[in-house]
Amino acid sequence: MIAPAVLRALRKNKTLRYGVPMLLLVVGGSFGLREFSQIRYDAVTIKIDPELEKKLKVNKITLESEYEKIKDSTFENWKNIRGPRPWEDPQLLQGRNPETLKPKTT
């Protein structure tokens, strides 16, 4: 059994009290991060099914295809409705009030 004087001396040693736990944290964190970063490299090496790959290539969305979809849309008939503030009644501002639903007269 270790003498009480030796235990007291070990408790007062700052290297053992602060340095060893810090060293364990750094080394343990390094191994932990290595495991998490390995997941990224494992995910890259996984090959997907060729049928699924063909399906993904067929459904590829490009900027030009999205532009063609909205090119003929009309954006003239919309109304800007302000959202309610925390102290205001949302029923009045979200278009449920008949006065706000009246069309503009030009």
Swiss-Prot record:
It is a single-pass membrane protein. Pfam families: COX16 (PF14138). Residues 81-106 are annotated as: Disordered. One of its GO terms (cellular component) is mitochondrion. The keyword rRNA-binding does not apply. Belongs to the COX16 family. This is Cytochrome c oxidase assembly protein COX16 homolog, mitochondrial. It comes from Mus musculus (Mouse). The lineage of its organism: Eukaryota, Metazoa, Chordata, Craniata, Vertebrata. The gene is Cox16.
